[in-house]
From Swiss-Prot:
Localization terms from the record: Cell inner membrane
Protein name stated in the entry: Prepilin peptidase PppA
Function statement: A pre-pilin peptidase involved in a type II secretion system (T2SS, formerly general secretion pathway, GSP) for the export of folded proteins across the outer membrane.
Topology relative to the membrane: Multi-pass membrane protein
InterPro entries cross-referenced by the UniProt entry: Peptidase_A24A_bac, Prepilin_IV_endopep_pep, Prepilin_pept_A24_N, Prepilin_peptidase/N-MTase
Length: 269
């Protein structure tokens, strides 16, 4: 089968994973930019604030274009990472700067896929971790931009983990994965409720609760404290570096780092 080919050619999997990561990262950039716009349009349409004559945006249409000059991006200018480097981070037509976030998301996804292929070679679990990485990267960037974790991403994390356990590709049994989800939800929801009473404000978003619960289906109930500890440390470091102080902190990226770090710690130790 396919894994037999990877055994015969051991470098094939890392190379394929890296290239696939660049391509998926390019698609994630589209999702990160367009999905919040799509939801705002749906809300405007629901409230009657958007006419049928106004153009709607989707993940497929319109084609990728420069947000400054509206020129459609040529195929040769849409190669993940390399096009940004060749164009020196500027639009070919209007010379407007292209955000560094685009190549960073592509590079981060490629590195995440590469690392998973090296730690879990010839494994369905390695593929599952790649999918998890894609969900978490998209969710984290959207949370950084909008301080909001869309349900579609937290549900993606949840169901990918449960399906991997059901297919016996996960280190966890399906029962352990479900237990991890339930423990994660009860723990963080209780913490959210208590913090709301004590602080008299929302200390944890519901998206954070759902993401923590979903990660429980990947790491198991016993490793959830590790996720919370790493996430809290990351949040503290982020707050100090950005000097956010008492302002709202997007906790989704911290939970994502905590979940991924815990998975690799479980594999390596």
């Amino acid at each position: 089968m396919l894994f037999d080919v990877f055994q015969q050619y051991p470098t094939a999997m890392p190379v394929l994973a890296t290239v696939g990561g660049l391509i998926i990262g390019s698609f994630l950039n589209v999702v990160i930019w367009r999905y919040p716009i799509m939801l705002r349009q749906q809300m405007a349409e629901f409230h009657g604030e958007m006419s049928s004559a106004q153009s709607k945006i989707s993940l497929a249409l319109p084609r990728s274009h420069c947000p400054h000059c509206q020129q459609t991006i040529r195929i040769r200018d849409n190669i993940p990472l390399f096009s940004w480097l060749m164009l020196k981070g500027r639009c070919r037509d209007c010379q407007a700067k292209i955000s560094k976030r685009y190549p960073l998301v592509e590079l981060l996804t490629a590195l995440a896929f590469l690392l998973a292929s090296l730690v879990w070679p010839e494994s369905g679990w390695g593929l599952a971790v790649m999918i998890l990485s894609a969900w978490l990267i998209a969710a984290s960037v959207i949370d950084l931009d909008h301080q909001w974790l869309p349900d579609v991403f937290t549900q993606g994390v949840l169901w990918t983990g449960l399906i991997a356990a059901w297919a016996q590709q996960s280190p966890l049994t399906l029962q352990d994965a479900v237990t991890g989800v339930l423990v994660g939800f009860i723990t963080f929801y209780s913490l959210r409720w208590i913090a709301g009473i004590v602080l008299r404000k929302e200390a944890l978003g519901m998206g954070d609760v759902l993401l923590f619960a979903a990660l429980g289906g990947w790491v198991g109930a016993l490793s959830l404290p590790n996720v919370a500890l790493i996430a809290s440390c990351c949040g503290l470091i982020y707050a100090v570096i950005t000097k956010r102080g008492s302002t709202t902190l997007p906790f989704g990226p911290c939970l994502s780092l905590g979940g991924i770090a815990t998975l690799y710690l479980q594999a390596l130790f």
